[in-house]
Every structure is written in C-alpha cells, then in structure tokens.
Amino acid sequence: MNRAQSIMSSVLIFFLLSASHIYSQSSTNYTFKNTSLDIVTDATGIAMGESSVANPENQAAYFENPAAIPINTGMQIFYNYRSHNWMALAENMKYFSAGGCITTSIGNFGFAYNQFSSGQIATSPTDPQINTEDVNRTFILSYSNSILKNLYVGGSVKLFNRSLSSNGSSYSVTSNNAYLFDAGILYMTNGFFTAEKIKDKFNAGASLQNFGSDYKEEYKAFVTETMTQKLPRFLRIGFAYQLNTTVGQRLQANVDFLLTGEYKRLLNPGDSEQNDVNYWGAGIEATLLKIVSLRLGGVASPENSILWDKGKFNLRYGIGLNFPLAVLGLSHPVTIKFDYAVMPINQTSFDKSQKSLYAFGVSLVYGKSVL
C-alpha cells in the first residue's frame, strides 16, 4: 500500500471514530448517544431490559433515576463491565463503571465513574505503532431522600467529556466538560398480599436526564474545527412489581419474582431522529433462596443497530449470584454479588462479527445480609 492509500485509510478510521463511535453522524442530524452518558453497563439492568427507573433493588438504578438509589442497604461498592467488541475493528471497545452508594441518616448517596474506550486501534496499515484511542467519561454524584411516606425524590450532577488521541499523528478530538443534571421521583407501596408466606410491593418511578450546559468538541486534523454536539435528554417512566413467596411445609424455601417495565423518550431529537424517539424495556427475574437469580428481558428501539432490529422486542438474558458471608459462619453482614448478562447481536455480517456481547458485575454489600 502506498503512502497516499495509508493516509486515506488513517483519515477514514479517524472520522469513523469521530462520528460518535459508530452511530451519530452530525451535530444537527443526530444526538450524541451510545456513550458512557447513556449506555447501561450493569449486567442486572441489561438482562432486565434496561428498565430500572423504578427498581432500587438494582444497585445501579440511580444511573436511570437518582431517586432510586438503593434504600436501607447500608453501603455498596461495585464494578461493571460491558463488552462492545462486536467486529474486528472494534475488538478492544468496551464500557465499564465503578462506584458505590450508601444509606445515611440524612439521605442516600450514590457516586460512579463510567467510561467508554475504543482501545488502541491501528490507523496505519504500514506502521503498527500508529494508533488511535477514543475515550469518553461520565462522573456521577447522586442524592435521594424521602419527602413523604413511601415517596422519594432525587437528583444527580454529572460531568461528561471526550478525548480522541493518536500516537504518531496529529489527529485529535477534545471537548469541554459538560455539566448535566438529572431529577427523579420514586413511589413505593405495599401490594395486595400481606400473608406471612406471600407479600408483594409495587413501585413507580420517573426521571428527567441530561439537562445542562452546552457540549462542544474541537477536531484537529488538517484543519481545526469546533462543533457543538447535542447530548441526549431523556424522559423515563416505569414500574417494578415484586412478589415474595415462601413455598413448602416442612422444608420451606423463598422464591421471589420481580417484573419491571420502562418507557424512555428522547426529548431533543436531531433532524434525522424526529420519528425515532420512543424506547421500551421490560424484564422478569426469578430468585431462589435469595441466592440465585435468573433474568430475561428485552428492549424495543426506534433505531437499527448491532444489538436490535428497529421496532422489535430484542431479547437478552442473565444470571445473578448472591453469596452472603453468613453461610461461612461470619457475623459481619457482608454479601458478595456476581451478575452476568448476554446480549445477542443483530448484525453479524461484518469482519469477524461476534454472535453476542456480554456484561458482568461484581459488588460488595455491607450492612444488610440477603439471608
């Protein structure tokens, strides 16, 4: 390959990365989606159809609704990983998040760091030392408290930025820090059953996301250009219904069920997204002995992507394991949790396409044992 072809190949890959990883195409036609700001990274939420707006049982629910920080659970810390290596060029792409939440006498606090990384991508077929990495980051600080019995409100402050750097070339993208805010509400009430062996609860939640300052990117290649990008603003509305049962007579066992659903609307669509604003998600979970959870969910999107067909209910599934240290005879109320989810891929015609993506999470809960 000659030098001109090498340069053209590098420029092509550069602009591919500059175009919101894979999806967004311009600052006016599309919002800058599928970043660390809006992608769900926790395996529980993914397997449940990304429908956690009213489910504080999910430790990362405050990513979707700041009022849904886990309540009366002591302290939790977590790490989540979501693969995005759907084809050869994207073999190092990934999302991850780390953070925690805590219940105090003055309310519930949550904090997290989310990141997308393309990994090192070779941008010169003749020089493997020349590569490019695209990274965007979101910092989150959330707070919630009850204002009435069973009624919680919450808010989040976020910082979002992006950088694209090239080793061995002058290509780069930098951005300002965008400061954004979320607000949410959560109502929790007992359901219809109050017997000793069967009880239920119902939650309803809603949130507004990503309102705040302008977001601008500076592109440096052969020329320098500054562009204002639209970050996606969402309205989320949803519910969660939990049914707790005890089965058996002489040998009793806990069997719990959770059903969640969510509607998400893009409030500031770009010129090419005016009819692509409605997202739906739902999930069901069955938990045996409060130890093993099986999950099945799905997402209906107004867009076609590698993970879903437009307008169809696209399934994903997962499993969760809770390991309370009390089973080892320890007196400390500590539980270790592991969650895993699988997302089948819709588009498999690309070079070395995967058939599915995965996500996993590990967390430590202190202050409330599951037993």
Description of each model-found segment:
Residues 20-24:
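Sec/Tat signal peptide C-region and signal peptidase I cleavage site
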